[in-house]
């Protein structure tokens, strides 16, 4: 594959600009996988720079499961109404709503979880490890690992994305920020399930 074909392929796969793709490929010695990783890292850095900008515009994304027993509303914010009308942004809102319907997170971010709840979970995991005969230090390390797994179950941003489990939801949003060039924030969501 020629260099131009590789650049084109990565642009289509990542949505990054041509010069960004070319630089990443050069820095990665024209190794496709390393270049994708570099683009993801650089996208995360761009996202971090934009994270403190205020996002007041946006849309309410929605999803109703085909059996009409589960529905989701998600508020996705951006900085301008121009971006709110962007197809990529609207598709992100729809994908997030579908993800929430399937994965049933309880919180948007880990910061929303009450400290008492986290500590309660941590103590349960420590006690379970101690009951298995593990020493206190090992039990605490085991508890930290299980707590991380717990966060992946209940926190939207920490969950593996339902359409691509190699990517966490927060990484998906960072990729969208890098492509769109504006801060994007999941403000809140509401999931309805018939009979629940």
UniProtKB/Swiss-Prot annotation:
SUPFAM superfamilies, per the entry: Elongation factor Ts (EF-Ts), dimerisation domain (SSF54713), UBA-like (SSF46934)
Gene Ontology molecular function: any one: translation elongation factor activity
Annotated transmembrane regions: none
Annotated InterPro entries: EF-Ts_dimer_sf, Transl_elong_EFTs/EF1B, Transl_elong_EFTs/EF1B_dimer, Transl_elong_Ts_CS, UBA-like_sf
Top-level division of the source organism's lineage: Bacteria
Region described as Involved in Mg(2+) ion dislocation from EF-Tu: spans on this chain: 80-83
GO cellular component assignments: cytoplasm
Subunit structure: Heterotetramer composed of two EF-Ts.EF-Tu dimer complexes.
Gene that specifies this protein: tsf
Organism for this UniProt entry: Thermus thermophilus (strain ATCC 27634 / DSM 579 / HB8)
Protein name as catalogued: Elongation factor Ts
HAMAP family noted in UniProt: EF_Ts (MF_00050)
Family: Belongs to the EF-Ts family.
Predominant localisation class: cytoplasm
Localization terms from the record: Cytoplasm
UniProt keywords, alphabetically: Cytoplasm, Elongation factor, Protein biosynthesis
Keyword Cell wall biogenesis/degradation attributed: no
One Pfam family matching this protein: EF_TS
Described purpose of this protein according to its UniProt entry: Associates with the EF-Tu.GDP complex and induces the exchange of GDP to GTP. It remains bound to the aminoacyl-tRNA.EF-Tu.GTP complex up to the GTP hydrolysis stage on the ribosome.
Cystine bridges: none
């Amino acid at each position: 594959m020629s260099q131009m074909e590789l650049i084109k392929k990565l642009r289509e796969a990542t949505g990054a600009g041509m010069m960004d793709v070319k630089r990443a490929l050069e820095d990665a010695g024209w190794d496709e996988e390393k270049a994708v990783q570099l683009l993801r890292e650089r996208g995360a850095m761009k996202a971090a720079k934009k994270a403190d900008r205020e996002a007041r515009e946006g849309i309410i994304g929605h999803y109703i499961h085909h059996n009409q027993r589960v529905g989701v509303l998600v508020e996705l914010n951006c900085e301008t109404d121009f971006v709110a009308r962007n197809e990529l942004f609207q598709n992100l809102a729809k994908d997030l709503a579908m993800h929430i319907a399937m994965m049933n997170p309880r919180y948007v971010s880990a910061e929303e979880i009450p400290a008492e709840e986290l500590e309660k979970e941590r103590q349960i995991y420590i006690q379970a490890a101690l009951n298995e005969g593990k020493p206190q230090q090992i039990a605490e390390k085991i508890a930290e690992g299980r707590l991380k797994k717990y966060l992946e179950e209940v926190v939207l941003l920490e969950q593996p994305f339902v359409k691509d489990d190699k990517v966490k939801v927060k990484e998906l949003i960072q990729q969208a920020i890098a492509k769109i060039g504006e801060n994007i924030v999941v403000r809140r969501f509401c999931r309805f399930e018939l009979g629940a």
